[in-house]
A protein has these predicted regions:
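Non-catalytic, conserved peripheral segments adjacent to functional cores
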Residues: 1-110, 131, 138-195
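Conserved metal-binding segment of the jelly-roll/cupin
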Residues: 107-131
């Protein structure tokens, strides 16, 4: 496992170790032991995943930018098992020196990269291939009453989604999220969300 730190503390890119031969490849997509040994020390705390989700989407689908409000906050470990997506984490912690900044990473069926998004971040992705199968590991269960989001189309975030606007396909719910400037974040950099 290779861990790549990004420009925002706690947001990580994880590259699994692949074993290839004439038959194809094999890799461990997740090992709790290895995550605890290698990732937890970087984060400064443990993360215990309890729910796995999978979505299938077609080209131009954009999902996000989502989060769950306290006390049901979620960290996510995501990957693309089929196709290609641009995955994004946006820091929405009040008082954070990186508030409003984002990290974007391309996740594909070929690079096998995984992306760790901590609590206090909004998360979203755009499908860049004909179809994509996307998997999420979450460290808290889904609570619809705690659902939140900011607009995935907010140009002030400076995200290049690599999709022409006319091809963007959003759910009705995702078209109604507030822009960052109108958003009152439930997260604060001084509150430890992992206690």
């Amino acid at each position: 496992m290779n861990i790549i730190k990004t420009d925002i503390e706690g947001v990580l890119i994880i590259e699994p170790r692949l074993f290839r031969d004439a038959r194809g490849y094999f890799f461990e997509s997740f090992s709790e032991r290895e995550f605890e040994e290698k990732v937890a020390p970087i984060l400064g705390h443990s993360v215990h995943f309890c729910q796995d989700n999978e979505s299938m989407s077609s080209y131009g689908v954009m999902r996000g930018l989502h989060f769950q409000r306290p006390p049901y906050t979620q960290s996510k470990l995501v990957r693309c098992v089929k196709g290609r997506v641009l995955d994004v984490a946006v820091d929405i912690r009040k008082g954070s020196p990186t508030y409003g900044r984002h990290v974007a990473v391309e996740l594909t069926e070929d690079n096998h990269r995984q992306f760790f998004i901590p609590k206090g971040f909004a998360h979203g992705f755009a499908v860049l291939s004909e179809t994509a199968v996307f998997q999420y590991k979450c460290d808290n269960f889904y609570h619809p009453e705690a659902d939140g989001g900011i607009s995935i189309l907010d140009e002030t975030l400076g995200i290049d989604w690599k999709i022409p606007t006319e091809h963007a396909n959003l759910s009705e719910k995702d078209t109604k999220h507030a822009m960052l400037k109108d958003f009152d974040s439930p997260f604060d950099i001084n509150v430890n969300l992992y206690k």
